[in-house]
């Protein structure tokens, strides 16, 4: 079995880090700041898409992204928390499957975070934004992860937003939606029939399948 985990809202809570870094970038560029709610509603999308949706002009988006990344790497480990049961979920999953991370976050920062939490050693692969041309909801991130892992027909993607689940559907792999993050249950139900409160519940389910 292969289990692929999303990060934000699935294993970690980086809401504070993301929101504060967005505000920093808007301050640095003298741009009207969006509300916390507007930012949180877009978590899971690539940074350039988030800035576009928040009203930044096309030609300035990558300047904002650069400012964001410069600040985020300074504060990520300080302002990011593991979700309850995340450690147990990963440890239990490692007993029954080969593990990977598929995230829209920058991969190198994601690796630093996982090393900070002493969890990176459980994962055989980590696919981040810089590793793909087309991020989730495209199938590419999952397919790229699978190319780097031993072939296995029993593949599961665990994530908290429709982006994770659509990506899984496009990649023709199984999916589990979790309610520990940013996706609403009504929306998640549209893309998977398997839904649990958190990653640990999802892993316990997979131990019985």
Where are these regions (language model features)?
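N-terminal helical cap/lid subdomain that shapes the substrate entry/recognition surface
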Residues: 1-87
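Conserved Lys-Pro-Asp/Glu-containing loop-to-beta segment of HAD-superfamily phosphomonoesterases
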Residues: 2, 136-165
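Conserved H-loop
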Residues: 32, 57, 120-124, 152, ...
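Short, acidic loop-to-helix structural element flanking the phosphoryl-transfer center
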Residues: 74-101, 107-111, 139
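Surface-exposed amphipathic alpha-helices with a cationic face
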Residues: 87-95, 146, 165-169
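Acidic, Mg2+-coordinating phosphoryl-transfer loop and its flanking beta/alpha structural elements
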Residues: 156-194
């Amino acid at each position: 079995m292969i289990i692929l985990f999303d990060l934000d809202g699935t294993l970690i809570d980086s809401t504070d880090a993301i929101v504060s870094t967005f505000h920093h970038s808007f301050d640095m560029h003298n741009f009207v700041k969006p509300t916390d709610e507007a930012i949180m509603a877009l978590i899971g999308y690539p940074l350039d898409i988030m800035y576009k949706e928040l009203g930044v002009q096309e030609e300035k988006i990558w300047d904002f992204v650069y400012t964001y990344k410069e600040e985020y790497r300074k504060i990520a480990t300080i302002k990011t928390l593991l979700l309850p049961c995340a450690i147990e979920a990963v440890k239990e999953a490692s007993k029954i499957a080969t593990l990977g991370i598929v995230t829209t976050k920058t991969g190198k920062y994601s690796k630093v975070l996982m090393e900070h939490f002493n969890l990176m050693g459980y994962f055989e692969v980590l696919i981040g934004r810089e590793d793909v041309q087309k991020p989730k909801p495209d199938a590419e991130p999952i397919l790229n992860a699978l190319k780097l892992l031993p072939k296995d027909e029993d593949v599961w993607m665990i994530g908290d937003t429709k982006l994770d689940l659509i990506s899984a559907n496009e990649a023709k792999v199984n999916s589990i939606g979790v309610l520990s993050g940013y996706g609403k249950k009504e929306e998640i139900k549209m893309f998977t029939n398997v839904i649990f409160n958190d990653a640990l519940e999802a892993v316990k389910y997979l131990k019985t399948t």
